Amino acid sequence: MSAASVSKVVVVFSGGQDSTTCLIQALTQFDEVHGITFDYGQRHREEIEVAKSLAKRLKITSHKVMDVSLLNELAISALTRDAIPVSHELMENGLPNTFVPGRNILFLTLAGIYAYQLGAEAIITGVCETDFSGYPDCRHDFVRAMESALVQGMDKKLEIITPLMWLNKAQTWALADKYQQLDLVRHHTLTCYNGIVGDGCGECPACHLRKRGLEDYLQNKAEVMASLDKATETGKPQT
């Protein structure tokens, strides 16, 4: 399915840097942009109110907040248990302790059902394999497998679009700047695992990744923007 044949999309929207950047881009490309936000009792659940505020500010077609508290009961993680401190070290299985097992499986499944009911042709998600937090459900192969499962399971053409898949964090900042929304993304989104809007706590892994990307972009704007254009043109990982 080509982007030209898509007019209505559902954006998996957390209110963070990545999903907000995807939402901003989608508003320039599609006739109807519907956001869906998931409340799973997350540690940083302030992001839900941030998502509501941004949805209104950006005037998207509709915004739905869905209760998926069952995920909190099933998945033990630093993002679902306040008693588990967020760690910079990997667990024995090689994953960060902020990994929520099954989260993107559930989110994309529910977004797919919602897209089916709306008659949307695509789901947009801000997952990224190039410069990510080590989550297996952010990988390209996973997304393609989920897309195939949704298409086969619902007998409907449905594309999962991943605008950030092969971008690093600096390029993601450049993408927001390309649409004249760098300040909005910097100051009004919530990426911090401790629930602090904007630049965040500065200590958690999410804040470190976000800050490093921003500093790289601000120090090398022309170079990063050029690399963004190349990555966007090829749609493939950059070597």
Curated annotation (Swiss-Prot):
One of its GO terms (molecular function) is zinc ion binding. GO terms for biological process: queuosine biosynthetic process. Pathway: Purine metabolism; 7-cyano-7-deazaguanine biosynthesis. Binds 1 zinc ion per subunit. It holds the Pfam family QueC. Its cofactor is Zn(2+). The keyword DNA-binding does not apply. ATP binds at residues 13-23. It catalyses: 7-carboxy-7-deazaguanine + NH4(+) + ATP = 7-cyano-7-deazaguanine + ADP + phosphate + H2O + H(+). HAMAP family: QueC. This is 7-cyano-7-deazaguanine synthase. It comes from Shewanella sp. (strain MR-4).
